[in-house]
Amino acid sequence: MLLSGIARQSRVKTTPGVIIIEGVALSEIESTLTGARLPFMMFRRIAAVLLSLCLFGLGTTASSRYMSVDEVKPGMDGVGRTVFQGTTVEDFKVHIIGLLRNTNGPKRDLILARIEGGPLARTGVIAGMSGSPVYIDGRLLGAVSYSLGQFATEAIAGITPIEEMIDATTGPDAAAPVKRRPPPVPMTAAGIAAAFDHATSPVEPFASSSAHVSYTGLAGAYDGRTATALRPIATPLVAAGFDVDAIQPILQLFERAGFILAPGGAGATIGAATTQPGPMGPLRPGDPIGVALITGDLSFGATGTVTEIDGDRVYAFGHPFYNVGLTRFPMTRAYVHTVLPSLLNSIKLTSIGDVVGTIQQDRATAVSGTLGAGPRTVAVHVALERVGRPRRTFTFQVADDPLLTPLLVYTALYNTLSQHERDYGAATYSLRGRTAIRGQADVDLDEIFAGDQPGVSAAAAVAAPLGVLLNNDREPIDIESIDLSIDATEHPLTATIERAWVDATAIRPGRTVPLKIVLRTWRGDDALYTVPIPIPLNADDTLTLLVTDGPRLAQWETRDGRPAVGPDTAAGLIRRLNDTRHNNRIYVRLLGRNGGAIVASETLPGLPASVLSVMEGDRAGGGGASLQQATLGAWEIRTSMAVSGQRTLTLSLDGRGQQP
């Protein structure tokens, strides 16, 4: 009676290493026992019972927090939590159907369940629910993360076990980056997309057609078509400030990985406001959460739902974001404007908010991160000018990731140009700027792009060096900022190399001869340039003068074997990028017949034949690369136009002059 009285007015709570008997103070228990003047043996029995209660509480705290898949039985009922509108977490019912063993890979199980409540009867499983926690008897089972079928009459979902979410994302949150395939230089929009597509090439957990599967582990209850329908819940993309055409290349790549653009998310104001009404309070399981890829004057990211918060550790989604492993994406709050019902794919219309932490792991069964200050991002500043219009400035922050950063910068810059300048018709962009790198020299940008869609080329020229830098296999590189100044004009500022000649009657070693170059501008006018060419004293009897544009010079250098040996250091890589041939230059090369070599990224022209023979024998060991011709002199002339064309002159030093 005495013990039952204490039990009736109290409740035992436990936390790791702590026992709390609510409603009864220890002094009260002591006074009750001593005041009752119990015999010694009775006192021992009561103490033993209390001790057993305490030990029982201690033994169940760690294991009772999460429910193992081994405990799951068909017919169990639970409750899920998510936000259908605003920031209010609402409950929905969960009815367990069964367990699919090894469905998502070896020792990667999925729990099948029917969900109901709120708008689910008319929406089915909703894009944006990924990560919604499911509890059975107060214990966390996992995250709603997969949907079954399209045009389904019932909301049937797959639940990723919480233990697998924690297991997949447990480990160091920082490691040496994995080398990915960098985009080519020079590059195009298609080149950026191809590099991104090749680097990801996701291995989907479920087949894309019924011909690829015949059995799913449902004990014959369903045929092979089940596997084509069981997929991760689509992840809503939030895009504010973007034109649909400008965002299309990156959108196609994300859609292939299971993302879906929220209606009105591009080219409209939905999601543009990143501030939500009133304070949102601390992050909770069931709250919407965002992964921000671009913030600032543009906004681009994705949203899901928080599954679990353990201290400052956050688990969400229940399936991958893009399954890129270690990440440094900003974690943000999110706001649900409403749910758009659809027989094909219902979706939460969301916007991303303030940064509350860092997404550090993107794995097959979850994304996870840490609450606190957000990660370092790449700051992009753009100043856009055109005659007759005021100067415009744009600033946005881009997620720092070897794979995504070049693609995001390209998309943001192209979108900015297409939104504020003409998208079609003749135009010219004069681009100057720099990419600042921590602890290294800047990468300089100086190009002119003219034609019907120069914005594509301008954006690609900025993104290309980023892909090379971030994916180099020499040493890590941190991009700090990108500062750009762009002058726009609605005229095609182009020029062609029309003529080139040496204005001298005799060409002898030791003399300087004038090289004349005529450019024919887009208006039909001629522009004359003069370059003094000193002839070396030890020059061959016959020399070659190459007058060319930047792209053709790069092609010639490739044929001559000059890029065969890559730089050994990040500094060497930056020097190589700064030596990239520009399309607003006239390049002149004086070439001799005696070749040279490239050693440790340095060009050595005019080497003796004996040295070249030794180097050729050592070429297989990576000792260097031979050159077919020796460069005896190099000049470049900067112009205010995009230059194209090439002229080659053969110079004879015996007094006969030149042969075009």
Tell me what each language-model feature is.
Residues G5, G57-G59:
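Small side chains
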Residues G59-P660:
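Terminal presequence/propeptide segments associated with secretion/organelle targeting
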Residues I19, T32-G35, A48, S214, ...:
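Alpha-helical protein-protein interaction elements
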Residues G23, C54-L55, G86:
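Alpha-helical transmembrane segments and their juxtamembrane interfaces
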Residues R37-F40, L53, S63:
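Generic intrinsically disordered, low-complexity segments enriched for polar/acidic and small residues
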Residues M1-F43:
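N-terminal secretory signal peptides that target proteins for export/translocation
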